[in-house]
Amino acid sequence: MKRIALFLLTNVAVVVVLGIVASLLGVNRYLTANGLNLGALLGFAFIMGFGGAIISLLMSKPIAKMSMGVTIINAPRNGDEAWIVETVRAFSEKAGIQMPEVGIYEGEPNAFATGAFKNSALVAVSTGLLQGMTREEVEAVIGHEVAHVANGDMVTMALIQGVMNTFVVFLSRVIGYAVDSFLRRNDENSSGPGIGYMITTIVLDIVLGFLAAIIVAWFSRQREFRADAGAAQLMGRKQPMINALHRLGGMRPGAMPQSLQAMGITGNIGKLFSSHPPIEERVAALQNSQSA
């Protein structure tokens, strides 16, 4: 479960930076030239919101490789690497997607999938996962990650993040305009947004961005149930995924950046912000599902 640090932090950072650049370019003066132009602001918020989410999505794979120290398996160096590649290949063919890049990285038990497009994704597993699980359990985890790719979860989460970003940008500027107008209510010579507007919007972009992450995390948890069921379907039976979840429940999962946590296999953060449901809920959902 690896994602309450990178996609979110990258996304918030991109939105804040774009907001500052827009201020420096005078966009805010245009929006407030004759009072707050709500129509123009909504269009601006839409561009900013989805722009931040799309940039984060496009950056997801290179950031994952760099931040996790992933080694791409182009030519397997041992039996484990050859088995991982062939397992990903078999599941990809069964799921109807092109073969993702396959990687391995040093770390405690975990795995993740990422990438902007389902036919050019990355699936990576940790050395700790290979050492701490049976092959059948690792196979189930790989199936879970391939299911994420086949379900288009990265794009889905980016679209949800884009909607939330739009609300964040819109609300922060409406509130910023109100605060700035109040602070300068006795200044008849003022024109355009002041320092109160800029400070308020930057602070609210960050604060509201983290509140929006709670909603994004809820959607992410629902995608995890689907990926668990997808792994069971790819393997033709659900017990290996259930066994893998039980095993992970007794392990200490490896830490991952936030942008990867929603596409990982387990997590270790507060429930509201957690991108993954509790292990016991996932096991119960899988046991009660119609998969395999």
From Swiss-Prot:
Its cofactor is Zn(2+). Binds 1 zinc ion per subunit. It comes from Acidovorax ebreus (strain TPSY) (Diaphorobacter sp. (strain TPSY)). Belongs to the peptidase M48B family. Zn(2+) binds at H144, H148, E224. The active site is at E145. The chain crosses the membrane at residues 4-24, 38-58, 152-172, 199-219. This is Protease HtpX homolog. InterPro entries: HtpX_protease, Pept_M48_protease_HtpX, Peptidase_M48. Gene3D superfamilies: Metalloproteases ('zincins'), catalytic domain. The lineage of its organism: Bacteria, Pseudomonadati, Pseudomonadota, Betaproteobacteria, Burkholderiales. GO terms for molecular function: metalloendopeptidase activity; zinc ion binding. Keywords: Cell inner membrane, Cell membrane, Hydrolase, Membrane, Metal-binding, Metalloprotease, Protease, Transmembrane, Transmembrane helix, Zinc.
